[in-house]
């Protein structure tokens, strides 16, 4: 009887703990369900966007083409095929590279305090450089670990790299491209 009670309590604890869990590590999930999602593809990348943001997606493709030749300068492994997801229904301006699953997400509302280059081009250069950085983490011990735990190994590799180096390198790249 005591074992059954302990098993029931452990099961209840496990169920209560999962209340806050979700399938993704990070999700901006603010897009209306009425969006019809489209995509534009090239050999190197894919832009996923709602049908209402076709103009933003076209500009993003243009900027990706503009920065592609220089984006992996200084790294052994070049950029890789990765989807770029546009989220236009927001009031923030930011970008995010996620590795689980691999993608680059853009909150496409322009920043109020713009710089010398078009805001979207700056964001594309910055976040695309982060994607190249993550791709270069996947070698040596981390690559071996990826055969055991999958894409999460690159995330573990991020713990070995200082944040100031990652951000500084991305800012330097976007500055060099301005």
Residues covered by each model-derived region:
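Juxtacatalytic substrate-recognition/specificity segment
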Residues: 23-156, 162
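Short helix/loop segments within enzyme catalytic domains
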Residues: 172-178
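Glycine-rich (often Gly-Gly/Gly-Pro-rich) flexible segments and glycine-rich loop motifs
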Residues: 165-167
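Cleavable N-terminal signal peptides
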Residues: 11, 21-22, 177
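Cleavable N-terminal export/targeting peptides
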Residues: 6, 22-23
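Sec-dependent N-terminal signal peptides
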Residues: 4-14
């Amino acid at each position: 009887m005591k074992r059954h009670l302990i098993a029931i309590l452990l099961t209840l604890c496990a169920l209560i703990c999962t209340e806050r869990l979700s399938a993704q590590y990070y999700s901006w999930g603010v897009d209306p369900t009425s969006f019809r999602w489209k995509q534009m593809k090239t050999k190197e990348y894919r832009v996923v966007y709602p049908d209402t943001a076709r103009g933003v997606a076209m500009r993003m493709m243009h900027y990706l083409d503009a920065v592609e030749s220089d984006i992996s300068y200084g790294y052994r492994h070049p950029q890789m095929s990765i989807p770029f997801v546009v989220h236009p229904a927001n009031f923030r301006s930011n970008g995010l590279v996620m590795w689980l699953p691999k993608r680059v997400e853009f909150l496409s509302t322009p920043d109020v305090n713009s710089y010398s280059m078009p805001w979207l081009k700056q964001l594309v250069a910055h976040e695309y450089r982060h994607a190249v950085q993550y791709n270069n983490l996947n070698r040596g011990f981390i690559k071996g670990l990826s055969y055991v735990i999958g894409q999460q190994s690159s995330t573990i590799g991020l713990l070995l790299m200082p944040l100031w180096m990652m951000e500084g390198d991305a800012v330097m790249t976007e500055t060099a491209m301005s």
